[in-house]
Amino acid sequence: MMGMRAKKICMAMLLIVGGIMAVFLADRKVAEKITEEEYQRFLDGEVPAMKENGKTYFLEDLFGEDVSDVETFLSDIDGDGVKELHIRNGIYYILKEKKGKLTILYEGTAIYDEPVEAMSGILYYREGGAPYNETYYFTRFEKDGTMVEGPTYQCYDSDEDGEIGVEDLYLKDGVEQDRTAWEKETEIYRAIKNERGL
């Protein structure tokens, strides 16, 4: 049985851990509020965002004078617990506050890029013709916003029978790959494509 002193020590430790967690959660809420306020200042044209090359851009620099039809949303794409600002209209940008500066984390295409928060990344999917083909690649984000690009997967209806099947061409980073391996490696991407109707 636990003595009175051991019980007091356990209670003190629980209070300390609980206090640390409360401070951590409060700090995260404050960080999220400050970050969201900074995002709004960017959207209002008050502050610029910086690309990795050091150049700064206001919203109008990225999308032109008329920004009325620019889609914006918040999503924690890198899994750090703080939401990033996603803005798109033809071009797709993700902004994150890094080291006290609003930084453009990602630049892609709004037509082909699909955010997948559960996987901390962006799925690129595109269909093409002559012959029919599909391209997939996934860019994952580390918690600090660092991008990790995955392989590019392509399949071609090389026999031009109107469907991707056994006799067709499967590539991984431009190198022919066995259909079974290709299907296994792209299974999650194809499931996302089908689920979201891409």
What residue ranges belong to the model's regions?
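Beta-propeller blade repeat segments, especially FG-GAP/WD-type strand-to-loop junctions
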Residues: Y92-Y106, E117, F138-K143
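Acidic, small-residue rich beta-repeat scaffolds with periodic aromatic anchors
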Residues: D27-R41, V47-P48, D61, Y125-L198
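Beta-propeller blade termini
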Residues: S68-I77, D113-I122
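N-terminal Sec-pathway targeting helices
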Residues: M1-I16
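Acidic/hydrophobic-patterned starts of short beta strands in beta-sheet-rich repeat architectures
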Residues: G79-R88, S120-Y125
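Hydrophobic alpha-helical membrane-insertion segments, chiefly the h-region
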Residues: V17-D27
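Hydrophobic residues embedded in beta-strands of well-ordered beta-sheets
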Residues: Y92-Y93, L102, G121-L123, T146-M147, ...
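Blade-edge motifs of beta-propeller repeat domains
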Residues: A31-V67, G100-E114
